[in-house]
Swiss-Prot record:
Keywords: Amidation, Secreted, Toxin. One of its GO terms (cellular component) is extracellular region. GO terms for molecular function: toxin activity. Its main location: secreted. It is found in: Secreted. This is Cupiennin-2e. The keyword Disulfide bond does not apply. The keyword rRNA-binding does not apply. The lineage of its organism: Eukaryota, Metazoa, Ecdysozoa, Arthropoda, Chelicerata. It comes from Cupiennius salei (American wandering spider). Belongs to the cationic peptide 04 (cupiennin) family. 02 subfamily. Expressed by the venom gland.
């Protein structure tokens, strides 16, 4: 069950990253949040 949750979160994160990547400076903000 835990594995399926991780997979779901990974898919959501991937979609969010793609959307943010289209906006200037969004990837920089994303890196700041990960740190």
């Amino acid at each position: 069950a835990f594995g399926t949750i991780l997979k779901a979160l990974a898919k959501i994160a991937a979609k969010a990253v793609k959307k943010l990547a289209t906006k200037p400076g969004a990837t920089y903000m994303l890196k700041q949040n990960l740190e």
